[in-house]
């Protein structure tokens, strides 16, 4: 059984624009999955189906094996399981202080005050934002706002966190910190689904990758399986990770037959092995 699954999912906006065109997407409990695609591929629209914000034109979304029902009571249960973090944290953060914002979700669950305070404290600690409880969110940096948005979802204690472009607008250091946070949450058992077009981060963190283009899934598999399909990557208007592109150049232009790798560690090992063999 998959914790999140879509079957033959189609979606059209009221003006008739077709955005999703037969999406089949499966995530197992405990996985960290990346959805890769250029802007306009339909990634955000797909994610809005995972907790029932959007309703498919055709097909279905299943959470823990059960199709989503769109009555109010059923959607509350779905959103206890699947938490969604928007690309722009300013779309999600609205309370006067960090503490109040993170507390908003648990309070809406009707939890007692003591439990809400406990969850807020734990969530802020998990994202490294202890000490910011009384800060106004608009005084925070972009990376700090992302962390507060994630904390707000963590405080709901979902089984799955879905993040739309979590590194968008961040500098490289900020992006790495957010991805390390998500990686650590995943290692503690949280199922993580992210959308991104940052191909350099994906091989480092993801268990499984989907490539999306023009409302369709072009490829799925491990990072190695996906990035080895260079033709599909370029068809989706994406590029190879920079280290893999270096190997491609060495292979094709310099006739140096170094084995493919997709992270710095893999490529370093493959280059060292090649040099040892040559010596």
UniProtKB/Swiss-Prot annotation:
GO terms for cellular component: ATP-binding cassette (ABC) transporter complex. It is a peripheral membrane protein. Residues 4-239 form the ABC transporter domain. Its EC number is 7.-.-.-. The keyword Nucleus does not apply. GO terms for biological process: cobalt ion transport. Keywords: ATP-binding, Cell membrane, Membrane, Nucleotide-binding, Translocase, Transport. It is found in: Cell membrane. The keyword DNA-binding does not apply. ATP binds at residues 37-44. GO terms for molecular function: ATP binding; ATP hydrolysis activity; ATPase-coupled transmembrane transporter activity. Forms a stable energy-coupling factor (ECF) transporter complex composed of 2 membrane-embedded substrate-binding proteins (S component), 2 ATP-binding proteins (A component) and 2 transmembrane proteins (T component). NCBIfam families: cbiO. ATP-binding (A) component of a common energy-coupling factor (ECF) ABC-transporter complex. Unlike classic ABC transporters this ECF transporter provides the energy necessary to transport a number of different substrates. Belongs to the ABC transporter superfamily. Energy-coupling factor EcfA family. This is Energy-coupling factor transporter ATP-binding protein EcfA. It comes from Methanocaldococcus jannaschii (strain ATCC 43067 / DSM 2661 / JAL-1 / JCM 10045 / NBRC 100440) (Methanococcus jannaschii). The gene is ecfA.
């Amino acid at each position: 059984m998959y914790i999140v699954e879509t079957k033959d999912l189609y979606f059209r906006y009221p003006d008739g624009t077709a955005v999703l065109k037969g999406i089949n997407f499966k995530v197992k409990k405990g996985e960290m999955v990346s959805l890769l695609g250029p802007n306009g591929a339909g990634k955000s629209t797909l994610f809005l189906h995972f907790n029932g914000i959007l309703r498919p034109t055709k097909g279905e979304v299943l959470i823990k094996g059960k199709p989503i029902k769109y009555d109010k009571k059923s959607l509350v249960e779905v959103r206890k399981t699947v938490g969604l973090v928007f690309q722009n944290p300013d779309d999600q953060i609205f309370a006067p202080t960090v503490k109040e914002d993170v507390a908003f979700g648990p309070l809406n669950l009707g939890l007692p005050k003591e439990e809400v305070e406990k969850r807020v404290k734990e969530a802020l600690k998990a994202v490294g934002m202890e000490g910011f409880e009384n800060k106004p969110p608009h005084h925070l940096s972009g990376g700090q706002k992302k962390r507060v948005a994630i904390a707000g979802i963590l405080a709901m204690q979902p089984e799955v966190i879905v993040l739309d472009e979590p590194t968008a607008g961040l500098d490289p250091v900020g992006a790495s910190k957010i991805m390390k946070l998500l990686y650590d949450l995943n290692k503690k058992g949280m199922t993580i689904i992210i959308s991104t077009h940052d191909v350099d981060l994906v091989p480092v963190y993801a268990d499984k990758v989907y490539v999306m283009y023009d409302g369709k899934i072009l490829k799925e598999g491990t990072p190695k399986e996906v990035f080895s399909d260079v033709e599909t990557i370029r068809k989706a208007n994406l590029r190879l990770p920079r280290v893999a592109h270096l190997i491609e150049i060495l292979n094709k232009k310099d006739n140096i037959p170094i084995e493919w790798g997709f992270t710095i560690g893999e490529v370093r090992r493959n280059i060292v092995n090649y040099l040892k063999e040559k010596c």
